[in-house]
From Swiss-Prot:
It comes from Chromohalobacter salexigens (strain ATCC BAA-138 / DSM 3043 / CIP 106854 / NCIMB 13768 / 1H11). It is an enzyme of class 2 (transferase). HAMAP family: SHMT. The modification N6-(pyridoxal phosphate)lysine is found at K229. Homodimer. It comes from the Bacteria. Pfam families: SHMT. (6S)-5,6,7,8-tetrahydrofolate binds at L121, G125, H126, L127, S355, P356, F357. InterPro entries: PyrdxlP-dep_Trfase (IPR015424), PyrdxlP-dep_Trfase_major (IPR015421), PyrdxlP-dep_Trfase_small (IPR015422), Ser_HO-MeTrfase (IPR001085), Ser_HO-MeTrfase-like (IPR049943), Ser_HO-MeTrfase_PLP_BS (IPR019798), SHMT-like_dom (IPR039429). Its cofactor is pyridoxal 5'-phosphate. Belongs to the SHMT family. This is Serine hydroxymethyltransferase. The gene is glyA.
Length: 420
């Protein structure tokens, strides 16, 4: 028998201490990893409910277990909210992650050995877009497109590759691209060779939901996304379509269950429903616009200070900072900024001379800092602090710059806590 006063503290103090240390880190460090954000207390509340106890293989009204009448309501609400939020006619809220959502789409639309065309990792693509170490590169004939000399997608080159290789599926979307993608052009290219168009909007789903970035739903055969990142929900995946194609939708359903997953995580699906509903609130659009404005403010400072921003700027929530010209590695810059309590991630840049474990760039994103209340002024200051550390690294010793910036970071984090 359980009692509701059971606590982790006192039962496993080592685990509890690590958990509390992470809470402290999130409050005391500035988060600039583009794929991270802070979930609302409502989202976290849903994930801590007794829904975690319920097994519910199947779909609402068609379960393989009894006692699902209440979780059916939960999943139906999540589906309803997802469709309404994105203007979709189909939604599957069961994928445990964005990668599993992509894997289900592969399983539904293409066969092992088929050709797929996606963005390369060093151009800003994702592992599941055909990278060699991933299932998408191991089990499929993956052809990759990159960026032109200006750091932009060359649609004519994508079209040429499509005509040459005749892919069964083309993947648009990114994990590190800072410009607006022409979804209609991608659909035109796909239609020209008879390919399916998959759009992975994991990074920009929140921007799309708020209407501050063009939606791929009118153009793609299928759209996948995560539910965290700019959506500020729980970690999970989502498959959407506006094609009104019952045959394809049936394939998506069976590719998720039983094709790649068993029981859905009902506590996470409840949290997804909450995040979809939160994204329909009026202040969510203002938040997403601020995310973009903050990213623009930061990119502008880096450019003014002589640093190269891939693609020349940003029109979304992130940008890539190339350190090739400065002779710095992403790995070293990541570590130096971490010592100043600024969290970023090292990232490959186009034609990167370094290995993927070292890299020559940083990926910088503003969703998390915007959630905690940063505006353009704070973000411009923050970019300047980062430049101070990078400048000092080029002189050989950044320890004093790191200490100075750390003090500034502590002050602004105390003024703008994540959870008040």
């Amino acid at each position: 028998m359980f009692t509701r006063d059971m606590q982790i503290a006192g039962f496993d103090d080592a685990l509890w201490d690590a958990m509390q240390q992470e809470v402290g880190r999130q409050e005391a460090h500035i988060e600039l990893i583009a794929s991270e954000n802070y979930a609302s207390p409502r989202v976290m509340q849903a994930q801590g409910t007794q829904l975690t106890n319920k097994y519910a293989e199947g779909y609402p009204g068609k379960r393989y277990y009894g006692g699902c009448e209440h979780v059916d309501v939960v999943e139906d609400l999540a589906i309803q909210y997802a469709k309404e939020l994105f203007g979709a006619t189909y939604a599957n809220v069961q994928p445990h992650s964005g990668s599993q959502a992509n894997g289900a789409v592969f399983q539904a639309l293409v066969k092992p050995g088929d050709t797929v065309l996606g963005m390369s990792l060093d151009a800003g693509g994702h592992l599941t877009h055909g990278a060699k170490p991933n299932f998408s590169g191991k089990h499929y004939n993956a052809v990759q497109y990159g960026l032109d000399e200006n750091g932009l997608i060359d649609y004519d080159e994508v079209a040429r590759l499509a005509r040459e290789h005749q892919p069964k599926m083309i993947i648009a979307g990114f994990s590190a691209y800072s410009q607006v993608i022409d979804w209609a052009r991608f659909r035109e290219i796909a239609d020209d060779v008879g390919a399916f168009l998959l759009v992975d909007m994991a990074h920009i789903a929140g921007l799309v939901a708020a209407g501050v970035y063009p939606s791929p739903l009118p153009h793609a055969h299928v759209v996948t996304t995560t539910t965290h990142k700019t959506l500020r929900g729980p970690r999970g995946g989502l498959i959407l379509s506006a094609e009104n194609n019952a045959e394809i939708e049936k394939k998506f359903q069976s590719a998720v269950f039983p094709g790649s997953q068993g029981g859905p995580l009902m506590h996470v699906i409840a949290a997804k429903a909450i995040c979809f509903k939160e994204a329909m609130e009026p202040d969510f659009k203002a938040y997403q616009q601020q995310v973009i404005d903050n990213a623009k403010a930061m990119a502008g400072v880096f450019i003014e200070r002589g640093y190269d921003v891939v693609s020349g700027g940003t029109e979304d929530h992130l940008f890539l900072l190339s350190l090739v010209k400065q002779g710095l590695t992403g790995k070293d810059a990541d570590a130096a900024l971490g010592r100043a309590h600024i969290t970023v991630n090292k990232n490959a840049v186009p034609n990167d001379p370094q290995s993927p474990f070292v890299t020559s760039g940083l990926r910088i994103g503003t969703p998390a800092v915007t959630t905690r209340g940063f505006g353009e002024s704070e973000c411009a200051d923050l970019a300047g602090w980062i430049c101070d550390i990078l400048d000092a690294m080029q002189q050989g010793d950044a320890s004093q710059a790191e200490a100075d910036v750390k003090a500034k970071v502590e002050a602004v984090c105390a003024r703008l806590p994540v959870y008040r």
